[in-house]
Design a protein with these regions (language model features):
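Walker A/P-loop nucleotide-binding motif
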Residues: 6-27
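AAA+/P-loop NTPase substrate/partner-engagement loops
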Residues: 32-68, 76-80
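Conserved catalytic/switch belt of AAA+ P-loop NTPases
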Residues: 34-35, 59-63, 78-125
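Conserved nucleotide-binding/hydrolysis micro-motifs of P-loop NTPases
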Residues: 49-52, 75-78, 104-114, 151-157
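Conserved AAA+ ATPase "SRH/arginine-finger" region at the nucleotide-binding site
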Residues: 108, 124-137, 144-158
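C-terminal alpha-helical "lid" subdomain
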Residues: 150-173
Length: 173
């Protein structure tokens, strides 16, 4: 809401177990904000394969009057993929800086966006293993907001929903 109203906001990484509603939450936020202020936020889905072309998109969006939420669903990287470096530069703002009218939200099953075995392999094979690992893990640090979605059983889920319903005064049947 802050971002849609022209105020600064953080890029966000929603990470956690599959099927816990990460993508649904991003889409619901977009719908909610546009329900309050029609057209306040334009959602653009970005595929991982499109990350290298993001600088061109940002250059175009920079001059637009609208606010944009770039959304990459199920983001992760494998050992042979170095496009995470491009994303890191984009999240940091690069030389030109991230446009004030653009935010980046991503969902992932991985907190650090890299497979654990990929990170551990860097530890075992690199000359300066801690530096190599830090470079790969630091991508997730570029997101100002991290939201973790943890698995829970059905009873715990129902308890969470009931507490929220009570808090917001919602009637449940």
């Amino acid at each position: 809401r802050r971002f849609a109203n022209g105020l600064p906001a953080n890029n966000a990484l929603l990470w956690g177990a599959r099927g816990t509603g990460k993508s649904s939450l991003v889409k619901a936020i977009h719908t909610e904000i546009n329900g309050d202020i029609a057209g306040a936020l334009i959602l653009i889905e970005v595929h991982r394969e499109d990350i290298p072309s993001l600088p061109l998109l940002l250059m175009y969006l920079r001059d637009q009057k609208n606010r944009f939420l770039l959304f990459c669903d199920d983001l992760s990287f494998d050992a042979k993929d170095d496009s995470y470096k491009s994303l890191k530069a984009i999240l940091e703002g690069g030389i030109e800086g991230r446009p004030e009218n653009v935010l980046f939200y991503a969902t992932s099953n991985r907190r650090h966006l890299m497979a654990r075995d990929m990170i551990e392999n860097e530890r075992s094979t690199a000359i300066h293993s801690s530096e190599a690992v830090e470079e790969k893990v630091s991508l997730s640090d570029r997101f100002g907001l991290w939201l973790g979605f943890h698995n829970c059983d059905q009873n715990t889920y129902f308890a969470i929903v009931e507490r929220y319903a009570d808090y917001y005064g919602l009637k449940m049947e």
